[in-house]
Amino acid sequence: DIYFGTAHRGRLTLLSTVLGMPYRGILSKFQGNSNDPNEVLGSGDVKYHLGVSSDREFDGKKIHLSLTPNPSHLEAVDPVVAGKVRAKQTILNDKTTDKVFGILIHGDAAMAGQGIVAETFAMSQLRGFRTGGTIHFVINNQIGFTTTPHYGRSAPYCTEIAKMVQAPIFHVNGDDPEAVVHVCRLAAEYRNLFKEDVVVDMFCYRRSGHNEADEPMFTQPLMYKKIKQHPTTLNLYKDQLVKEEVLSEEEAKTKISDFKKFLDNELILRKKNK
């Protein structure tokens, strides 16, 4: 079993690509539809708080995945995930901690700014709370809403707090997908071997605003001028694959076009997913 805890950024992608939630199901939620209309007396919660569990198969092996629901209070989900992992390990009598573990996905500003992160690390090695290590993944977009790093923390890196338990910290470039995958595999192997926390700090950027209403050119004009001129990770990786002759330019364009058509079709089918 793997238990996930994350905030808003990247949550919908996690739901679809990792937990296998159909895109039409996610889009249906944006239409205000509910699995059970009688379950709430109101309009419900934002979609970025949605929790889902699923059973998936990877490399011929079945695994249970669970994304814990969370409130808008960043990082509040951290000890909840750790507690769920510990509880499931107890139920399964998983003394080796090989069967169940947790993955926490943080934002850079919240990682450094929210005290609950430090509290979760502080409890991670205690006999009554340890889980055999949590994998921490930081989506480091180098901004917290409108706060830049040098106004948000005193340390050079947002991950400094992890040093309190001597957790190894891997800094990786988000524009290099293969490097990110390599480091994540390394982090997973470290956790499984040494049964301790490990951190992956992925340096990237936030291409749009903090939310649907935020226009970052008002508060960070210089930063966002550079971001607008910077090619997307998709295009950078596509160009790399074409250069390495893994696929042709035409094949790449076809794959991108086919996926957009797939999403358009899911948007149509969402109406049936009420």
Predicted regions and their residues:
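Conserved phosphate-handling catalytic cores of large alpha/beta enzymes
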Residues: G144-A155, K163-V199, F203-G209, M217
